[in-house]
């Protein structure tokens, strides 16, 4: 059995989703490829946790798993922050269960969260399993499929450089005295942003993205961590100057950022101006997919 699973980029709702607010997440066209192999070798903590969750449901594939996440790495083999662990969890769950149904999602979510010691919203696992652009709450919870784009806007994903550990940023931000104020502002903006995206209001969506990025920056400042790094700030300013908007994609501190521009052809110009690399990625409408093997 062979499967492939997309990566993810968080579009809106960082931090606030941990407190019950909606988030928006996109599956992206970097795909993990997994296959069954006869012998079980050394497994990552995520795969081990998924195996434990799968075995609790009954018979599973007893052999090994091989999961290739090379598409989630940069030219220097650095991880890009595109959700390789979530994609690996979904791939492992499908291979162990021998199917692609909803039980696979539940096993992947349980295993991924166990490997993270109970942390994480689960929206990355949701995107990996379902594909497309989604509005979703803390998982398991409501999920709404949204259009892959707003007419007149182009999504670009930029690599910001080395990242900080997500859990350390979340811990620092939650410890900030102003956490409750900021998380309420982020929650309000996330809800308004989902509504703007749903109604395909490009101008309102861009305004919400800019405001969300500023609020993330304010939270990071109060918490003493660079949620918005200097490269990300350059991108946010540059995108706005081009008539668009940008923000960190995830907890911040590096990894990737998302930007929307009215003109797709200006993405290379923006990348050159801000000194960052636009990744060759797009929204992937397909989530978990069973692939044909040469021997089949």
Predicted regions and their residues:
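C-terminal nucleotide
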Residues: 2-12, 16-18, 25, 33-60, ...
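Glycine-rich active-site/cofactor-binding loop and its immediate structural neighborhood
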Residues: 254-256
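DPxDG-like acidic metal-binding loop motif
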Residues: 28, 79-101
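Short glycine/threonine-rich catalytic loop with a Thr-x-Gly-x-Asp
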Residues: 82-86, 246-251
């Amino acid at each position: 059995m062979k499967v492939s699973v997309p990566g993810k980029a968080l579009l809106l709702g960082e931090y606030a989703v941990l407190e019950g607010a909606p988030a928006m997440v996109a599956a992206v066209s970097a795909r993990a490829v997994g296959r069954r192999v006869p012998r079980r070798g050394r497994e990552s903590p995520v795969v081990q946790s998924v195996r434990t969750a799968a075995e609790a449901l009954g018979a599973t594939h007893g052999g090994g798993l091989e999961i290739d996440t090379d598409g989630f790495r940069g030219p220097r083999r650095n991880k890009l922050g595109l959700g390789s662990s979530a994609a690996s969890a979904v791939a492992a769950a499908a291979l162990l269960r021998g199917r692609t149904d909803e039980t696979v999602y539940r096993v992947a979510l349980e295993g991924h969260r166990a490997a993270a010691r109970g942390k994480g919203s689960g929206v990355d696992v949701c995107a990996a399993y379902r594909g497309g652009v989604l509005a979703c709450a803390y998982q398991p919870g409501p999920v709404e499929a949204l259009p892959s784009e707003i007419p007149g806007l182009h999504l670009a994903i930029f690599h910001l450089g080395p990242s900080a550990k997500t859990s350390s940023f979340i811990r620092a931000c939650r410890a900030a005295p102003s956490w409750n104020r900021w998380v309420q502002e982020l929650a309000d903006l996330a809800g308004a942003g989902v509504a703007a995206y749903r109604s395909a209001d490009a101008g309102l969506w861009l305004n919400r993205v800019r405001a969300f990025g500023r609020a993330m920056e304010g939270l990071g400042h109060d918490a003493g961590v660079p949620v918005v790094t200097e490269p990300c700030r350059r991108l946010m300013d540059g995108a706005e100057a081009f008539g668009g908007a940008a923000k960190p994609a995830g907890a911040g501190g590096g990894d990737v950022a998302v930007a929307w521009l009215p003109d797709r052809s200006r993405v290379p110009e923006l990348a050159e101006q801000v000194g960052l690399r636009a990744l060759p990625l797009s929204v992937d409408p397909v989530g978990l997919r069973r692939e044909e093997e040469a021997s089949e």
